[in-house]
Amino acid sequence: MKKILCLLLFVIISESSIAQGYHNPIIPGYHPDPSVCRVGSDFYLVNSSFQYFPGVPVFHSKDLINWEQIGNVLTRDSQLPLKGASSWLGIYAPTIRYNDGTYYMITTNVGHGGNFLVTATNPMGPWSEPIWLSQQGIDPSLYFENGKVYMCSNPGDAVWLSEIDVKTGKQLSKSCMLWQGDGGRYPEGPHIYKKDGYYYLLISEGGTELAHHLTIARSRNIYGPYESNPANPILTNCSRKGQNLQIQGTGHGDFVQAKDGSWWLVFLAYRNFGGSYHHLGRETYLAPVEWKTGEWPVVNGGNPIDTLINATTLPKQMMPQAQPLDFNRADLGPEYIHIQNPISENYIFKSNKLLLKGHGSLSDNNQPTFIGKRQEQVCGSVEFKVHPKHNAEGGISVYQINDGHYDLFVKDGRVSLRCKLKNIDYILKSDKIWSEWMNLRVSYNDKMYKFEYSDDGTSYKSLGELNCSLLSSEVAGGFTGVVIGMYADGGDVEFAQ
């Protein structure tokens, strides 16, 4: 009886602790470079999207813990040209801000025009056409004060500031260098905040890998000079206490103050699996901030970031629910994305089926016919019925980069598993099939992807397993994470649930 009471007490205490805290990441899967703003009781957050279309996902939350994607900022080809963009190019590090009834999103389209901003009166859109900006560098940010608008970015390995006209994009003042950081490489991702008479300048340093970290400086004048925080870095897991944690690469953050006066930091990090490999990409995390009057901000009590964060002011974290696909809709939802700008006539929704018209290989950078979703969960599965016509190839791709993907596909009466890794391109296994429609299934955990097929949806046969680590950023490369989706090449392919 005593053992039962002790066990019951342990369970109650454990559940109570979880209810008072939350688990990171708050937005799992490839959602890097978060920026956030609060409007009344509502929080809005955006992320980088690189080569994918539509660009810059927009999330909404009432509590900083539970987030829902409500759309994408860049939904038109005229806003987001991505022709030939690899996973190293495209949309870098957006910033979202709200001022006087208008939402602003400023970002960089690397390889296709540089820095620009768009505006909207509703964060769900529609957003304006791009207003192009002359100040160079990446990771631009906006700061509004007394009718003036300032833009900061990082040309030349330093943070520079200028005043701009947000209606025309015209630069109204000469660019002024503010800070070169605290000695780490790649000072980037700048954001300016004003508090207690100081202008605080938050930046990332160290590059977006293992040594990524956040530093901060402040000044009484927006143009400087800026003094470094003696306690820099204010966020890092590349430390004695944090180096052995699963979460690494903490950096690129944005402060936000909740309605109750508390301060919080959203930032990117990644989770290592099977050693020092991450394949899900850089994800969005949250940490509490103590920011006393006139003092420097302290993130998470000065401790490294772990999966469970204790924060009694936040509500219960809800578990996300998987939503079934509806092929009767012409829009599968804002979370579904294409590699580069899609050719619209290659995607036809009809009679609860999706017809994909093949256009180029997944290994090329030429608008392949592909529609997928970021892999957000460590464990799960994806399954579709596939019917290629004539000599077409179609199936499911576990896609990290054009030089790194696993493809389970049907072609010419065979079902095959292909592994594409840089210069390696081979068929792991191929079986003869007789059914026109074939069920394809990809299931996964933290170590392996398993590839199976069935002609009746009940009895499945395995074609093999492939390691998650080979699609990691450390091996395959790129700035993104795994996206799992449907594709077609060389002809028409039908998909059904």
Language-model segments: what does each one mean?
Residues I4-I13:
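Sec-dependent N-terminal signal peptides
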Residues A19-Q497:
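Carbohydrate-active catalytic/glycan-binding domains of CAZyme proteins
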